Each structure stands twice: as C-alpha cells, then as structure tokens.
Amino acid sequence: MIFSQGSSPFKGDFSKIKFSIASPESVLAHSRGEVLKPETINYRTFKPERDGLMCEKIFGPTKDWECYCGKYKRVRYKGIICDRCGVEVTMKSVRRERMGHISLAVPVVHTWFFRSVPSKIGALLDLSTKELERIIYYEVYVVINPGDPGEKQGIKKLDRLTEEQYFQIITEYEDNQDLDDDDPAKFVAKMGGEAIHTLLKGLNLDESAVGLRKVLKESGSEQKRADALKRLKVVEAFRKSYEPQKKTRKKPGGLFPEDEMPEPYIFEGNKPEYMVMEVIPVIPPELRPLVPLEGGRFATSDLNDLYRRVIIRNNRLKKLIDIRAPEVILRNEKRMLQEAVDALFDNSRKANAVKTGESNRPLKSLSDALKGKQGRFRQNLLGKRVDYSGRSVIVVGPELKLHECGLPKSMAIELFQPFVIRRLVERGIAKSVKSAKKLIDKKDPIVWDVLEKVIDGRPVLLNRAPTLHRLGIQAFQPTLIEGKAIQIHPLVCTAFNADFDGDQMAVHVPLSQEAQLEASLLMLSSHNLILPQSGKPVTVPSQDMVLGMYYLTKSRIGENGQGNIFYSNEEVLIAHNEERLGLHALVFIKYDGHVEQKFDPVRLLDIISDDESEKKAWLKKEIEAKRLLVTTVGRVIFNQYVPEKIGFVNKVIDKKGAKELISKICSEVGNVQAAEFLDNIKQVGYHYAMKGGLSIGLADAIIPEAKIQLIKKATKESNKILREYNRGTLTENERYNQIVDVWQKVTNLVAEESYQKLRKDRVGFNPLFMMLDSGARGSREQVRQLTGMRGLIARPQKSMSGQPGEIIENPIISNLKEGLTVLEYFVSTHGARKGLSDTSLKTADAGYLTRRLHDVAQDVIVTIDDCGTTRGLHVERSIEEETGGQIKFSDKIRGRVASRDIWDTLKDEIVVPAGGIITEDIADAIQANIGVLEADIRSVLTCEAKQGICSKCYGTNLAVHKIVEIGEAVGVIAAQSIGEPGTQLTLRTFHQGGTAQGGIAETETKAVYEGQVEFENIRTVEQETINEDGMPEVRILVIQKNGRINIVDPDSGKVLKRHDVPHGASLHRSVGDLVKKEDVLFSSEPNSTQIIAELEGYVKFADIEKGVTYKEEVDPQTGYVQHVIINWRSKLRASETREPRIMIVSESGEILKTYPVPIKSNLFVEDNKKVSIGDILAKVPRNLDRVGGDITAGLPKVTELFEARIPSDPAIVSEIDGYVGFGSQRRSSKEIKVKNEFGEEKTYYVQVGKHVLANEGDEVTAGEPLTDGAISPQDILRIQGPNAVQQYLVNEIQKVYQINAGVEISDKHLEVIVRQMLQKVRVEEPGDTELLPGDLIDRTVFIEANTAIAEKVRVIDKGDAPARIQEDQLYKLKEITKLNRELRKNSKSLIVVEPAIQATSHPVLLGITSAALQTESVISAASFQETTKVLTDAAVAGKIDNLLGLKENVIVGKLIPAGTGLKAYRKLELNKVYPEAAEIAVPEVDEAAPASSDDDAAE
C-alpha cells in the first residue's frame, strides 16, 4: 500500500495486489530522509539521535503534536515543520509508517535473488551460484567487455579472471585506461555488486529469449534443453513483467492531489538491474522498537543491530573511498558491506549467520520476521489476539437451555463494560464515564440490573481450543451466574469435544449489529445440531442421559400392574404416580396414531394367565387391528416429549436409537422443536439415571464358566498345529498365522460368552450390561478384557506394516477381574504405554495434515448455481456393502444431484429425473429397492466452473440438508471434515491398551446372496486326493490368478455379488449351481499363495542351488529342515545371473511347464521327484494385515494418499490390454512383455525377488498390476486418466476412515480436496502460445492460452502485404482475410497462412503440500511454506494477486469473499422509496442468511 508524502494513507478500496522488485527510485520515493548514523538514542537524554536509526526528523515525532526541541507543542501547529530541529508537528503514529533509506557506497546484490534455487541472477547471466558467489564477494573479476586486449588474449565476455590475470592485462595495455568506458575497444572487468549491476543492465532480454527458444527447439542434448528451459523461465518472467507503461496514468480513485501520478509510483516492470541495490529501505522505527527495561537497560529489535552494522560499514567504506585507500582494503570493506546487507535481508540462510553477543543465537532478519509460525504472516496477520474476550474453566450447567451458557458476573461486567457505562450515563444513574466506572468498581447492586438488561438478546461466542471444525465456536445467550467458571450445556460437549476435567473455554463478544445478527442466526448452538462432515446429528445425549433413557424405556416381565388395559396415556401416568404401576411394566393402551415400532404380540400375551383366554383372544384381535398398543410405562413417559408428527416411539432407546430419532426430528419438524426435545430428554435422562441408582460394583462383572473349556480346546488346537509344524507339513509363517488365528477365534468366543452371560443376568438389568448395551459407556472390547480374557497383544514396533511377528502369539489368558500374572502384566504394559506416547506424537501429525488441507482448499467457494456440465460420476451398488466391507450405495448418492435419469430396472420407471436432488428419503428408498443398481451423479470432481465450484455439482449442504448456497466456503468445510476426525482418531489408540484385534483369516468363502453361480476367467485342474475319512475324492483347484465367481440373479441376469478367487483355491461349486446364503463357494489358504502343478511329470530344478539361491533353515525346536529361496545377488559376481524355477518334464525330458519361484518361497518338492496334478510345488508366504483397528497405521496412509506419494515398492502396472509373456533374464531383473492383437508391445523390467502375479499367457487389462506391491496413483493417472485416479484416491481414503476406523465422512469433502490436487497441467508442446514446455500451470490458464490463439493464424509467406505484417508472426484471421481481399482486388500476391498451433498438455497429480504452494494466490502460498521463495518468484514475475481466496483477504484485512462477505451481498441495499427497486436483481438469499437482514437491523 502506498503512503503518499504528507497526506494520510489512501482510503480507496483495492481489489488486487501486484508484487515486483523495488527500483531505487521507488525506495527513494517512499523514504523521508537518509539515515546517516548508526546511533539510535542518546544515552543521557534517551531522545533519538538526529540522522540516526530513530531520528525524529526522518520518521516523525515521538510525542503527539510536539517537535524534538519543544518549540512547537499542541495540535494547533499541525503540519508545521520546526525551523530549529526540522521535525514535523504531527501524531506519533506516523512512526509506524514513515520509512527512511541508506544510500550505499557501492551496489550490493540482493541475497534473495542470487541464493534462491534456481538463482535468478545466475539464470539471466548463465553463471552458476558458486561462480556468482565468487564475483559478488570480491574473489574474482568478471569480464564485462573484452575489447581489443581481450580479443588478443582470447578472453570472452563473462570470463572470470584472477587478480594476477587482471593486473597483467592492465599493465600490458596501458593505453586501455585512457579510453571511454562505453568504447567497444576498451577492456572492462569488474567485481562485486558493481559488476553484476553492469552486466544485468547490459542484458537484452528479447534476444536472450529468442536464443533460448532456438536451443529448446534445435538442441539434441537433454541437459542443454533442461538448462535452457530453466533460464527461459526467468527471462520470460522478466519480459512479461517489463512492459513499459505510459507515464501519464490518471490517478486511481483520487490517490494523489495532482492529476498525474508522480513518477516513483509508475510501475515500469522489473528491470534485471533492480536485483542489485544502490539504496536500501529502512523500515519505520515503531516496527523495530527500542524498549526501556528496568535497571536502565534497553531491549531492542534485532533489526536495529543489523541496520547498525550496515550503516557502520557503509560509512567506513565512504571514508575509505574519500581518502583513496588501497584496493585491497576497499575490496575487503565492500565484501563486508555485502555480507552486512545479506544478513539484514536473510540471516538464517547464511552458514556464518550473525549472532548476538550474550546468548549466541542468530539475529532475526527481515526474512525471518515473515517466515514460520512466529513470522508476520501466521502470527500477526492470520491469527490476532482480540479484545472483548476472556477465558475460564468450564463446568456443566444441567439446567441450562440448549442455546444458553452461564457467564460469571465478574467476567460479564468486564466484557460488557462499555455498554454498561453507556446505559448508566443514558439513564442518568452516573453523571460521567468516570463516575460510571467508579460505580462498576464498587459493584453497586444497580450495576447488575443494568448488566442484565445489556446482555439480554446479545449472544456471546464460546470457543474451545483446538478448534478443529466450525462447531468449535458457537454462539450462546449468556445468563449471569455466581462463581468464576463458565457453565455450558451438556449436549454441546460433543461438538466442542469438551469434558469437565479442567478444560478451559474462551468467550468473545460480537460488537457490531451485523456480527450479533450473524451470531444469533447462523452460529447459535440450537441451530447447529448437525455435523457438516456427515449430516448426522452432533448434539446427541451421552453417558448418564443415554443410560437414563435406556433404563426408562426398558421392559421387565413381572412388574407391578403388568397386563392392564388403559384408555389413554394420561391414565397410565396417573396409575404410575399412585404407585400401582411399575416403571417397566408392560401394558395395553388404546391408540390410533402412528407407531414407530411394534412388539411381538405373541410374547406379550404370555404375561396374561391362561385362564383368561377370552381376554387373550380379544387382545390379540385388537392388537392385530392396530387399535391397541403394547408398551411400557417408561415409554409413555418418554413419548410425552416426542413431537406429535413423529408418532409413538415404541422401542428401547439406546445411543444409536437416540441418534436416529434426533436425526428424524431435525429433518421432519425442524431445529426449534428438535432443540426443545433435546432439552427435555436431557432432563428425563438425568432424572431416571438418578432414580435407577445405576452404578457398578465388582460383583456385576461376571466371568463365564465356559471360559475354561474354551481355553483348553484352544490350547489343544495350538498344540496340534505345533505337531504338524514339527512334522514339516507347515512352514514357520503358516504355523504362526494359524496359532494367532486360533487364539483370535477363542478370544472372540470368550468375549461373546461373557457378553451373553451379562445379558441374562438380572433379566438384562445388570448395570454393567446396561451401560454397555445402551452405548452410555464402555465397549464390548473393554467388557471382554474385564470378564473374558485380554487375548493377544500387539508387539509394539516403529511402524505397523502387517509383518509376521507383530502379534505376540502367546495370549494373556487372565482377565482384569481375576488379575494378571506378573509376566502377563509385564507383556501388557508395553502396549499400553506405547498407546499413550503415540497419542501425543500423532496429534501433531494430524494437526499438520489439517493445516495442509486448509491451505490447499481454502479458495474453493461455491461461485455459481450451475456450471452446465453433462459429466458426472457413475456409482454402482457395491457388493461388499452387505458384509460391511464398503460404503453403502445410499451414502454415496445421498444429497447429490442426478446427472442422468436414475432408473428402476425391475419396474422400468424413472426414480429420480436428471437434475433432481436425491434427498435423504429418496436415498433410503433407493437403498431398499434392488431394482436400482447404478446411478449417475453430479460431482465436484467433474465440475467445470471457471473459479470455485457450482452448487449443482456439490449437491446439498450436509448441515442443513438443503442445496448448497452460493458463497458457501466448501473447501474449508472439507478440510475441517477430514482433519477433525484425523485428530480424534489418533487420540483413541490407548483405550485398547495395545491388545490386538482384527483379521482372522477366513479359509472358506460363503455366498452372501441366493442366486446362480457363474465363473469368470477361471482355469482349473482336478486333483485326486484322500479325504479325512480315508475315502478318495476329487478336488477342483484354480490355477488362474485373477479369476472370479459371480452370483447372478437367475431371473434378471444381474450380478448380485462378485468374489475374487485366489490362485490355488479349491472350488466347492460348479457353473450353473443354485446357491443359498451361507453356502460355501470355495476354500483357500489365507496365509500363503501356492504354486501348483498343472500337469503330471517329473520335477526338474533350474538355478536352485544350495547356498546360492536357497538356504536350509533348521527349526531349533523340531529339527525339521525347510528349503527357502533367498536373494542370490550378493552371492554372485556382477556378470552372473540366476533365475530359480521349477520345471515339470516328461519321462523323455521334454519341458512341459516352467514356474518361476520368488524369493522367500518354501519348496515342497525335491528334484527329480514325480508329481501329480494339483500337487503343491512351493508356497509363497502372504503378509496378513492383522493389527488392531486404530488409525496409527491409518493416518500415515491418509497422508501418503493426499500427498500423492509413490509407494516405497510400487507394483509394476500394465499400460495396455494384452497377453503376458516373459523375456530374457538379466542379472538383477527379468523382462515381462505385454502384447496385444494390434502388435503393440510394452516391456517391463522386474527386480529379482519381486513376486510376479501374472503367468505366461494370462490376459491383463490396462492398469492391472503385474507384480505385487501398492499401485502408485501416478501410474493410475498416466494409464487410466484423471477420472480413475480421482475415484481411486477417494475410495482409498474412505477405506481408512470409514471402513477401518468407523468414522463417517461424506465423499464430497474428499472430492473437493482431490479436485484441488488435479487442478494443474504440465505443458508438453507450447505450440504458438506464450507458454513454455514443462510449465506447470492451472488448467483454466491453459485453456485460456489456447482460446487466445484459436482465432489466429501464422503468416508463412507475406506476399505483397504491407510492411507491418511480418513472416512467422501471429495475426487475427479476420485481419488477414481483409488484407487478402484488398490484395486480390489490386491483383497482388496474397498472404499465405496456416492455423496457429494449439498447446498440448497432460494432467498432473500434485500432493496437497505442492498444490498449496502452486496456488495462484501469492499471499496464500507465502503464508503457507517457503515464504522467501514464493515472494522472490512473485516479485520477478510481477505477479498479481487477485484476492479471490479466504486466506489472502484475511491477511490484507478485508471481509472474506464467502458467506455474507460475498460481493453480491455486500452491495445489498433495501430501498423502500422507489417502486422500481423491486425489479433490481439481487442474488437469492436463504431466509436464514443474515446478509439481507443487516439493513433491517441498521434501519
């Protein structure tokens, strides 16, 4: 921003900010005078020294309206400049904005521009950073003009010369000195900043650009082209920014009193020589203050020290030049000046940074003041401390309403003091402000009355740190309370993630009318009942409230007064109050409303004795006719509070039920009634938790008798596995996995037993069971450890990678009630402690992930209603849904807009038309209707809005279940929705105490649906074996790697379920079989992949040599010898190679089939032995993911996906459809070829030891992995395109969150982030555009560049065209057509043209960090990371920040362009005078949006 001389800062609003390198003229224009002395203040008078770093003459007075010498005091002398001391009489605040300057004795290079990577100066001059450094620090001379002497000596421009060489030339050609400096014959060589300045000044950028483009086109060397490209980027940046503008620009918005702009403010673009400074600015003294401490010492900003060093060295150098000191001394002083200026601008980048005297820490330079968490951007611009705020400890306020909070009187009086004072003065209670303050200090009783009036209807904001999502700040209506703690409503604790063990919260007072309005309309806690991340309610009763409701609605047979028939609910309540009816008694009530859920009447009729058969028959008839309702007294009490529209809720209410009910109430009757209902059930819950007297004792934890038997059985099984291992039929890996499986199963059985035991205890009224079953506290996992057995424990390791040995195979058999043995206790401490330490470490990681997500998505705002795209996502009903392995179909389409008609194939009708919104109800109906198998929905991923996204592609705003409004900051909401659970999940690990859960490997795969069996891509062999009973049987084994069994609906032919069949599986069904649910389809070996003989013959080993390619492992316990293939590379010479394989040969020795054997395989056959079809030749161990379901493994996975990192050992993926073949074997890799029918062939080299998934002759599709390992998202993008990679990322991230950790996040939030990762394209061929090859640019910028040349043509032959038309240049087609018409008229030769060539590009997948740094906004990127680099690049390119995102607007102090800060809303005016005003188009605003109401409030 520009402060003009003498006048106040301009008030004009600005809409963009341009970055450029400051020219010496602009530095001088901003300066008020030169700082000549290094002194700051006089040690005796403590007043600033004249011409020093704090000088009042330059920077303004230190006291308001008073000059330095005291001649002029008082405001009446405003603007006068004192004739004695030269200080202007003005306010002292100008010392925050007035700048000075230092004129340097020699030019000095700006460290940012030569130390940045790639060096900007180096790129322009084609010098390396090392060489530049030697020139700048006065080590070597650089030739600026070789002249005649240079030519004779063979010296070229830019050659570096040592001192001896330089002096040799100077002495040899003495007459050289007499020539003028600009004489081409003169030899000129210089060093230091001066040399660089001269060289940069002499550059011709246009010529450089042409030369470099030529190299790019013609050079054959990759290295030369890469270098040229690097240099061209910098040259082009300068060229683009340097477009000399006319000097007579009119003032923008009345910036200057004259009609013309004074010269220093005219931006002429960046000249390269500006990177070398002749004057340096001195920032205002109040921004580098000098503060007196007690004891007469001073605390000073480091910048003052750094400036002092510069001034001292500069003055010394000036003196030395004046006295004509010898060159050696001058050179040393110049170097020191260069170093001092370097330290001032960027001290942390230097190896020998300038340190302070006492504490020996590096001084904070100008760059350090901007960088990092403590820098200007993040500390002072993005987060500020605010007044009208306070903080205190929180306690529960059970009697508060949902929208209220209790505010301590002592806090309220401080926060609202100005308003109370005003009220006191207005009402005449106090005469003046001062007396009003006295009244307040005295705590006069009348003050409290006034305070009550003041806070009425004024909401306050409560915030609990860390504020992870928008529900971390909510508005409440304060009520005054005694004491010093803030009271908050128990139901909002979930949103704040607060508890009452000493948490603190901050209170903020919204001041302006608009702020109060927004707080009470948009932020009030009773309006924020729903989580934006999933659309599920967040204000859900917990703990005591749930327990109370559960207890209230539970039924018990044998209660007082059961089986009675009542006419109405009121009768029931009267009978209960008179103690004739027990709370849990089952009764019959006459009812004709809507019932939520019915009991099984048959079971209920059992409560009536058999001799009353008539009554029984009548009851049965009435219940079936739905005239009688069977319910309990407690449910009648509960239903008094349920809104009428919902009907009678007739079921036990647990936490899940409460959540569903609240969700239903919110959507059907609205927030107001929902808030009332919540307050009521809070009261009821607490009341009945108290009435029930529910607490637990040791006796409530019951240990099941069956535990001993189960453990005996498991011990037996594990011994059997050991015996098999000792015989050698199992590998070490299989033994381990099978034993872990056995104990895992037993632990689960014991857990189930103990759970059932608790359920039966006291007819289900065991308090421990009630707490567990209601969802109030505890989990089945904890009950298992209390009353069952602790089970298997994970062995803590740095990373959980699913390797064998991560679970200790000896389980803890005791439970916590019995107590652990010393050894068991010791084993379990490890896991428990690791959980606690993980928690603290991982929270930081989750916080950093959130920050990166915010930065990448902060500028995604809903900008338009409909982008008009026809594209969308295709969603199919997934099969794994039923088994819980995938997200439900309805969850994927809920709240979206259909891009095409959604059909019900069974009824052949449209369920949702194109453009229709899929609401909650429609989504649930579609989920229940199996006729709808797929849907096309609009998605953020395919939105074509130029800026931001459109509301149709986003769908509904999950927090209000209405279509999203224009102006909604969906990017920030997405970042919060993903980041918040990330932090939550990391905090959950320690509750399990490190016990292992999860993967029991299934050996049998069963049908989930009824239907007909179909095979897809399955090859089999038959193996004759003997079964357990000693009878012969035939097993059908699968020998294809990527086979599938599909279950098909026999009528419609639709595939209901697809099962992947592993290699070596044994099939139990054949094609066409009809199967029922739970029928076994196939069984497989979960812990290893088997290599199976497909033919009969003899085994022949190739390259399987003892000690080279395999080793013998002897088990120390059993003495059994295993043959394990090892990595042989280290055993052989460089030229040698091996490829271990098992061949099957016929009797005559002909090779029938070859099987490559991967590293770590166990051999199951011996050389030259006969084998039959189906025999196992070798087993390859498979790692099972077994570690518990905490997100410790999950968070790094999410980070890896968002950062689009290439996995450490990625799978090799086929790029084309075709058939697999194997090529030759090299030393460290073997060749895999994929060939298709068109003759196209791709070759891949696979590292030895990597497991190849494909067999010779297998058919593969593009994108299918050929080897094991994770697939790299970059490969998916390259082979299958952007849509596939977007879907892949969203699905993989969802897997971690929803399936592994059970956290619900809507797909849209992930899509918003993934969209941002694919916003850039890399230019391949620039064609005729201005773009450069390899440029990484925004997709929209690329499209615009192509659109700009779409109507243009290139002139090949200009014919008889006028002189202004040049060959090989671009012109508009219209212009050329017009000229050709004229040329034809005059019978002259025409202009020959060809169409302009468009640029080509490919999409790039960026990780969120690089995407945030590549954002179009300079300010946003600079405040994220790598501040100096971002600012350097922006300045060189003369970039403009259009202030479109949220972050940049916060930094420059404007309203954010989202929500009510949207431009369209800011200009809203309500004119009631003119009838025509109604016709003015204003954006549609929802009733709740306060923007339009602001003016009502103001009027």
Swiss-Prot record:
Entry keyword set: DNA-directed RNA polymerase, Magnesium, Metal-binding, Nucleotidyltransferase, Transcription, Transferase, Zinc
One Pfam family from the record: RNA_pol_Rpb1_5
GO molecular function, one term: zinc ion binding
Cofactor binding mode and count: Binds 1 Mg(2+) ion per subunit.
EC top class, as a word: transferase
Catalysed reactions listed for this entry: RNA(n) + a ribonucleoside 5'-triphosphate = RNA(n+1) + diphosphate
Residues noted as binding Mg(2+) in the record, renumbered to the chain: 499, 501, 503
Name of the protein described by the UniProt record: DNA-directed RNA polymerase subunit beta'
Organism (species): Prosthecochloris aestuarii (strain DSM 271 / SK 413)
